[in-house]
Structure formats: structure tokens, C-alpha cells
């Protein structure tokens, strides 16, 4: 992964924790994602901020520090992890300032922030693979380049507001499918709002696809 792509994620949330693993490798931890740092000298979080060009009087606006991976978050292989297919749904949605891509699992779906995926998506790799793994009661996505772990990324929490908007979108798509194949002369202006194919005449929320808190 390129340093500039990893730095972009850190700058977005102003979070920079430099984490050492048991093998002596270093990682950037933004609390939403962990990325392997390669081709760089050993550094502290202050060194990382200096590389970003953050002025001394602005560093106090960052959440930063050093940590050691005692829990084994960066362990290459974890018991029970399952390989995923990236973007099997073939769709992304924009919500609360994020572009979210669904990753299907055998028992649900994980919505992943594309900003967090960008550093690994832009890697020059033909062997990139995604794995579902558990971590302290939650599910994470581990990204490997061949046999080497390069990132561990948290999915976005699906709150009630997000689920409501997805349900509205699904219902509206079902309604629209009801008009497919209907000849234009068969549709009146009134039908467009109160047709028999409509599941509800309730007005669609004007903020659909925006707002809400994660």
C-alpha cells in the first residue's frame, strides 16, 4: 500500500496510532482500520504526523499515540476466518457522507466504507483476498495480499436510520418494477401517484439517502 493512500485515511478522521506487532512490524491504527506500514523506518505517531506535514500547533487536534498489538489483531491467520468475495452485490450506496459497499456473508451483510477500502483497492496486487474474522465480539474484514495480511477493517454499524432508508429504497424499487412493460398510453397522471401497482401513496422522505448518525 502507498503511504499517501494510508495517510488520506488518517487525515480524514485525524486519528494516528502507531501499533507494533509481535514480529516487529508496524501498523497505522485509525480505530476503524489497521494498515501495514511498509518501506518506512521505525517511527512513532509524532514521526508519522511529521511525515504528513502536520504543524506542531495542530498536532493537539489529532488523536494519536503508540500501542502494542497484545490481542493479536494483526495475526495473519485467525481460527474460523472465512474468505469473502468483494462486492458480490455489485452495488454501493451513499449514506451520511460515506460510500458504502455491501459484502455478503453466509448469515448477513457487512457494509464497508469505501474510503477505508481505498488503500487496499489501489494496491498493485493480483492476489488480494478478503476474509471475515471475529474480533472481541464484533466482525471485521481482514485483507491479505497472497499470504500476507495487509489490513484489518471494521464494517460500518447499521443503525435504524440506515436500515429504514434501505427498506424505503427496496419498496420504491419494487413499485417501479410494477410499471415496467406498461404502455405509455395506459398510464394517467393520477396513476403515477395512486396506481394499483403502488404499495403505498405515502410521500417518500425528502432526506432519503442522507442524514443520521452511525
Residue ranges and their predicted role:
Residues 1-23, 27-37:
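Intrinsically disordered, low-complexity linker/loop segments enriched in Gly/Pro
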Residues 2-5, 47, 116:
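Exposed alpha-helical structural elements
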Residues 30-33, 53-214:
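C-terminal functional regions that serve as terminal interaction/effector modules
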Residues 41-50, 159-162:
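Short amphipathic alpha-helical linker/capping segments at the junctions of internal repeats
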Amino acid at each position: 500500500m502507498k503511504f499517501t493512500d494510508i495517510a488520506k485515511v488518517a487525515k480524514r478522521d485525524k486519528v494516528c496510532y502507531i501499533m507494533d506487532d509481535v514480529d516487529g512490524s508496524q501498523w497505522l491504527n485509525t480505530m476503524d482500520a489497521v494498515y501495514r506500514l511498509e518501506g518506512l523506518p521505525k517511527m512513532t505517531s509524532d514521526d508519522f504526523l511529521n511525515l504528513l506535514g502536520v504543524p506542531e500547533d495542530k498536532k493537539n487536534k489529532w488523536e494519536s499515540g503508540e500501542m502494542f498489538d497484545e490481542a493479536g489483531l494483526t495475526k495473519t491467520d485467525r481460527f474460523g476466518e472465512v474468505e469473502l468475495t468483494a462486492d458480490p452485490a455489485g452495488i454501493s450506496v451513499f449514506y451520511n457522507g460515506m460510500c458504502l459497499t455491501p459484502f455478503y456473508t453466509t448469515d448477513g451483510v457487512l457494509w464497508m466504507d469505501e474510503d477505508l477500502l481505498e488503500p487496499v483497492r489501489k494496491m498493485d496486487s493480483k492476489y488480494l483476498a478478503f476474509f471475515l474474522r471475529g474480533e472481541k465480539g464484533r466482525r471485521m474484514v481482514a485483507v491479505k495480499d497472497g499470504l500476507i495480511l495487509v489490513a484489518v477493517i471494521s464494517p460500518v454499524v447499521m443503525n435504524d436510520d440506515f436500515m429504514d432508508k434501505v427498506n424505503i429504497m427496496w419498496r420504491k424499487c419494487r413499485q417501479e418494477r410494477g410499471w415496467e412493460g406498461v404502455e405509455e398510453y395506459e398510464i394517467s397522471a393520477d396513476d403515477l401517484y395512486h396506481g394499483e401497482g403502488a404499495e403505498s401513496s405515502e410521500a417518500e422522505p425528502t432526506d432519503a439517502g442522507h442524514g443520521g448518525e452511525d
